[in-house]
A protein has these predicted regions:
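Donor nucleotide-activated moiety binding/catalytic core segment of transferases
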Residues: 46-94
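Conserved catalytic-core segment of nucleotide-activated headgroup transferases in glycan assembly
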Residues: 1-56, 135, 166-169, 175
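Short beta-strand/turn micro-motifs composed of small residues
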Residues: 41-43, 87, 107
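Catalytic binding pocket for nucleotide-activated donors in carbohydrate/polymer assembly enzymes
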Residues: 56-59, 64, 91-165
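C-terminal alpha-helix
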Residues: 142-149, 176-184
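An acidic, carboxylate-rich microenvironment
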Residues: 14, 77, 137-141
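Alpha-helix boundary recognition
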Residues: 33, 79-80, 144
Length: 184
């Protein structure tokens, strides 16, 4: 069971809520290797420690905020380099939409989250333009699509983008920002 609370650590023994065993984590690692994909898991600040031997996995690594700080890297620098993003209900997924790259949403605790913390939207799934992930097979499907260049939610992202972001009416974001800051 995954516990999510501002007061408690988040317990994810296999680092992704969609995984239920070490065997599934190993199966995911094998699938990632076959797809030529390297998975970086950014741990939530409240998430408890990694209890497994990281060296046992060829295509899975995790990073913490502390590791990024020591390297002088901001999270969004890393995000800009990613070919895809898996998130839950975090605002980073909304920001990632601007890059127009594949998104996956881990929804294993959707009802629990709805009942405890709640959502901004009544039907949050309608605002998640990406693959819905509940288990290992869904994760494999998401990575398989990325590996072969398939993006089944591209049109849905484009349709939702104006609802999630104020888009500049002119040609570029820099020009719109300069006008907004009154420096042009």
């Amino acid at each position: 069971e995954v516990l999510i609370s501002a007061e408690n650590e988040i317990e994810l023994p296999f680092q992704l809520p969609a995984l239920e065993s070490e065997a599934e984590l190993k199966a995911l690692d094998i699938h990632l290797r076959e797809c030529g994909i390297f998975l970086i898991i950014k741990k939530h600040p409240l998430q408890s420690g990694w209890s497994l031997d990281e060296g046992a996995y060829t295509n899975i690594r995790y990073v913490t905020e502390e590791m990024l700080q020591k390297s002088g890297i901001q999270l969004y620098e890393l995000v800009g380099l990613m070919d895809g993003l898996i998130s839950d209900y975090s605002s980073i997924a909304v920001d990632y939409m601007l890059l127009d790259r594949p998104l996956g949403y881990v929804l294993t605790d959707l009802e629990s989250y709805r009942n405890t913390r709640g959502f901004v939207f009544e039907h949050p799934e309608a605002y998640m333009p990406g693959e819905k992930i509940y288990n290992l097979e869904d994760l494999k499907d998401y990575f398989s699509h990325i590996a072969v260049g398939e993006d089944p939610f591209k049109e849905e992202r484009r349709r939702l983008l104006p609802a999630m972001h104020t888009m500049p009416k002119k040609s570029g974001y820099c020009e719109a920002l300069a006008e907004y800051l009154n420096i042009k």
